């Protein structure tokens, strides 16, 4: 640190060291010139966040100061020795509530709402999606969390024209192994989306490491009192309509 600054570390429960002494996460600390702050790899969880009062003063690109590695937009990616300028300190000091990140328990249970192509899986495929514990693959990143397990059986073998994708969409490619799309998801995708993970659970999924377990729990739609699998059948488009057709 080259000048006085307030900072905080949040996200995964990492160990914070200030000049070699252990400090806590999720609270503001005042750093003086010459202080050294270290964030140690957390025992659970994947991502920790360092915030400084005044923000990081780098040029804004399309309204953001983050780096998008896929599109090569934003500031130069961080490297050892990179100096980050801090912006002006805003006034007054904000008063906000404290929301701690809960510990990551594995297997992590997340809710799953029926997707527009849920009925492209067989009944056994729908059950298997929620009955087994999936393992997070090493191929996971901010684009999506790839899961390993027993492949899901698809009822419809045809492929789709590209359809819109959102964060949390659960897509099943020809391998039968699902993918949960993350914040760097593409705009469209050509494989059936059989379910959608709600936004609050997406934040929990983002803390999973390769090798961690995950289990889905079907959630019935608010408009029906049916059991989850019945809700899935009624929500998905009929496969008899064929890809690209609109539901009646």
Segments (PLM) and residue ranges:
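Conserved "landmark" site that anchors the functional core of diverse proteins
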Residues: 1-248
